[in-house]
Design a protein with these regions (language model features):
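Conserved beta-strand segments of the P-loop GTPase G domain that flank and frequently precede/overlap
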Residues: 61, 72-73, 96-100, 128-132
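Switch II (G3) loop of P-loop NTPases
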Residues: 68-83
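Conserved alpha-helical scaffold flanking the Walker A/P-loop in AAA+ ATPase domains
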Residues: 57, 82-87
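Conserved P-loop small GTPase signature centered on TRAFAC-class small GTPases
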Residues: 1-29, 33, 63-67, 123-223
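Conserved Switch II/interswitch segment of TRAFAC-class P-loop GTPases
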Residues: 92-111, 121-124, 134-141
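Conserved catalytic network of the ASCE P-loop NTPase/AAA+ motor domain
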Residues: 62-65, 86-91, 118-123
Length: 223
């Protein structure tokens, strides 16, 4: 297939050929929202209020002349919302698990988050692992090699460390996600085009209605 040519598009770009749903999960306080906001809005807020339930972000990118929209569901990590979050795994193409390099519990709890993905998502879901807050190097308790080993042992699709504060690898995470999902789309498409093949083409996911429905429910719950 050769090297993919990528160009990040503005957040408000609304014309796209493919759309994929991503879910960002992990313990509360690991920087999920800040990391996603840094990647999508190029903005960082030092004291960001914890996510209540969920938030939505969009990351747009052009790959080989195809415009791709990543619909990012940023979830809270608080136990009280765990049952609510479980419904968001449905139709997710990729899950991003985030831990903080200065928080041992957030790393230990990856086993629980991974189990949630495997039991509640579709069997073909891709999984990324992100070690966040590299700007807190002096407080590091989880070494890079530990994250790398966890990713390898569990056959995850991608591992990298990042910092929402400095912006390190924030966009890279979503660029790599888009590249992987686009490549998978081409594989499905090629498989389905072969004579006698029964393989399904990975569909363009129509997520806007799902987002609007969930937003409406969130507003109702907040009243």
């Amino acid at each position: 297939m050769g090297e993919l040519k990528c160009e990040v598009l503005p957040e408000n770009f609304d014309q796209y050929d493919l759309s994929f749903k991503l879910i960002v999960i992990g313990d509360s306080g690991v920087g999920k929202s800040c990391l996603t906001m840094r990647a999508t809005k190029e903005y960082f807020e030092e004291f960001y209020s914890p996510t209540v339930g969920f938030e939505f972000f969009t990351f747009n990118i052009k790959i080989n002349n195809k415009c791709i929209k990543l619909q990012i569901w940023d979830t809270c990590g608080q136990e009280v919302y765990r049952s609510l979050i479980s419904s968001f795994y449905r139709n997710s193409s990729l899950a991003i698990m985030v831990y903080s390099i200065d928080n041992e519990n957030s790393f230990t709890n990856l086993e629980n988050w991974l189990n949630d993905i495997k039991t509640q998502s579709n069997p073909d879901v891709k999984i990324f692992l992100i070690g966040n807050k590299t700007d807190l190097e002096d407080k590091r308790v989880i070494q890079y090699e530990q994250g790398e080993l966890f990713s390898k042992d569990n056959k995850l699709d991608f591992f990298i460390e990042s910092s929402a504060k400095t912006g390190l690898n924030a966009k890279t995470i979503f660029i790599e996600a888009a590249k992987l999902l686009y490549s998978e789309h081409l594989k499905y498409k090629d498989r389905a085009s072969r004579p006698g093949s029964l393989a399904d083409v990975l569909p363009v996911q129509k997520l806007d209605n799902e987002v609007n429905n969930v937003r409406q429910k969130k507003r109702c719950c907040g009243n």
